[in-house]
Amino acid sequence: MIEIKGKYGEAKVFTDTLEPSAEGLIKTFCDQPYSAQSKIRIMPDVHAGKGCTIGTTLTVKDAVVPNVVGVDIGCGMLTVKLNEKRIDLPKLDSFIRQNIPCGRDIRERSHRSHGRLDVYELLCVKRVDIRRAKESLGTLGGGNHFIEIDKDDEGNLYLVIHTGSRNLGLRVAQYYQNVAYKACGGRAQAAIPYELAFLQGDAMQYYLHDMEFMQRFAELNRTIIKEVILDGMKLHEEESFSTVHNYIDTENMILRKGAVSAQKGERLLIPMNMRDGSLICTGLGNEDWNFSAPHGAGRLMSRKDALSSFTLNAFKKSMDGIFTTSVTADTIDECPMVYKPMEEIIKNIKETITIEK
């Protein structure tokens, strides 16, 4: 464990290795006056993000920084245990590519289930693209977002869907971070960087309202993808559970940025990488960890560094024996080698979760 102290706050980092850029971001956050009111706990998969670290958890009282929650509000994993023991993987892959838009693509028309949520509930609705929001439901994000089939030691199959709030989450996050920056004095002051500008009072409450809506939007996005795949492939759900990151748990007022809830008895999923799959875990409810766990393995290097460090051939060799059509020159930045080893993460999370499988 590493402890970092700033001018006002201090943080515990639950790992023994920390890159300098991540340490600097944590120190800068702890130098902000509002950090004094928060219990800051950083997860083992910590790595540098834009203005703050991925893997951050903190208690929230009278101030909130929208950028710390991030632009993909409510992103998470939906884990669906299937009744089937065998699946035609090439057929599934082809079906997903034909029916689930991904990356920058959206649907040509809104999915029939878009009416389960009313975008006009957003208080900042005038600042977003409503048509694009509706047509984004049932779509997969780019980068490290994925749809995969995992198999446990007993032969059970799991459909795992990792995606979030798409362009709508970005628009909402950017709007409220701009509001925060203006409220803090904008360019007329130099003490608070744009990325760490904060909201208080009514503005904070407005943000919390819209942030909660975005969590429901992201959840519906994953649900629609699940329904499209199960219906189209004639698959059957036995049970399912969700594991969310990039949000504020408003019941307990805990912010999790690239971290997940691990309350006592709570089931959660921690994905490792494209090769090693995921861990199904149960939370231990450790208060010192802010009742949290890491949301993944955490990157060892930036996407730019990954593209220059590994070849497509090395990527292909690392995925030997695993069916995928996603091993290309464009996805080298997501190869297994750019993530921290699974053993390192497992070693550091025993105090907050138990691993089921």
Residue positions per predicted region:
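Acidic/polar active-site rim loop that often engages polyanionic ligands
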Residues: I73-L82
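Domain-length cofactor-binding catalytic modules of enzymes
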Residues: I2-T28, S35-I42, A48-I54, A63-P66, ...
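Glycine-rich phosphate/pyrophosphate-binding loop regions near the starts of catalytic domains
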Residues: T57-L58
